[in-house]
Amino acid sequence: MHKSTLETHHQPIMPVLALVLATFFWGSSFITVGSALEYTNPLTLVMLRFGVAAFFVLLMLKGRIADIPKRTWKAGAACAFLIYLGYTTNAAGLMTLQNSESGFLTALYVPITPLLVWVVFGKAPTKGAVCGVMMAFAGLVLLANPFTLSFSNNWGEWVTILSALISAVEIMVVGRVAPGTQARQLAFTQLFFTAVFAAVGLAVATAAGVPLKETTFNTTVVGGILWLAVIVAFVQVLLSWAQRYVPAGRAAVIFAMESVFAAIIGWFAGESLGTAGIIGGVLIVGGILCGEIRLPRRKAAPKELSS
């Protein structure tokens, strides 16, 4: 039986589809996060969102915390610290940036991740991966329309770039530790420690007198937290499994789909999506395909037999 003209390389397709599904749920959460933040602050939202999600994953584990190996706890704590730092720096950047500007700068993790993998592990990206990164990043530029950025005295821009670097490191670290762990156990430890770090951060911020919005527990906040917890629990299990098989650089390109899904869902919610946004979405999809699919090599022509 002949193989299809187009074939995926290196990894089976299911982990790639799992990452795409995870980015869909992440992208779908933007509107819920925005609504919840009208009645609470980012640290409280992260603490409750990840804490409830950890409880949901604990139910999947049937409460068997004692079965989680020490190395998984350590790996989960390291990943969670990066997740927490990424959320905190990104939220701080949003204090001085518009959503589109923040979205663009945060997406710098797409080109940063394969460069980090190259520098740290010596794994140079393939031509297909470079093509995919360039296309996906160009698409993100069109989606975010960041042309008002100044990079002068706006500290929020630099803090958001730091959050992108942290996200790139987190993707790389998860890709490194995931193969040696059980997906649900790693997901639980990440969620648990992220909630703990957020709680500590909230306590420190409160003690230091940092102005934080008080939380109003209405149906919007409670319902939002429960829904966001379901999403993050499901997504972390998917990521902990799929990143065993998909290299960090390629995973970063796939994660760029988060902006596409957020834009599409925003459009259904009444937000505008112009021609540039549509072209940007197409470029991101093209970047993923460029990195994941290749044409089979042509067989060398048989040499002519000498007479």
Language model: regions and residue ranges:
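C-terminal transmembrane-helix exit sites in multi-pass transporters
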Residues: 56-67, 110-134, 260-279
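C-terminal-most transmembrane helix of multi-pass membrane proteins
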Residues: 2-6, 17, 48-51, 145-146, ...
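Specific transmembrane alpha-helical segments of multi-pass solute transporters/efflux pumps
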Residues: 25, 29-30, 58-106, 113-114, ...
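Helix-helix packing/entry segments at the starts of transmembrane helices
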Residues: 46-48, 102-108, 174-196, 232-267
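Hydrophobic alpha-helical transmembrane segments of multi-pass integral membrane proteins
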Residues: 14-18, 44-59, 128-138, 155-162, ...
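Loop-to-transmembrane-helix transition segments
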Residues: 14-23, 61-90, 155-163, 212-234, ...
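Hydrophobic transmembrane alpha-helices of multi-pass small-molecule transport proteins
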Residues: 57, 77, 125-146, 164-167, ...
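Glycine-/small-residue-enriched transmembrane alpha-helix faces in small-molecule transporters
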Residues: 1-47, 89, 150-176, 198-200, ...
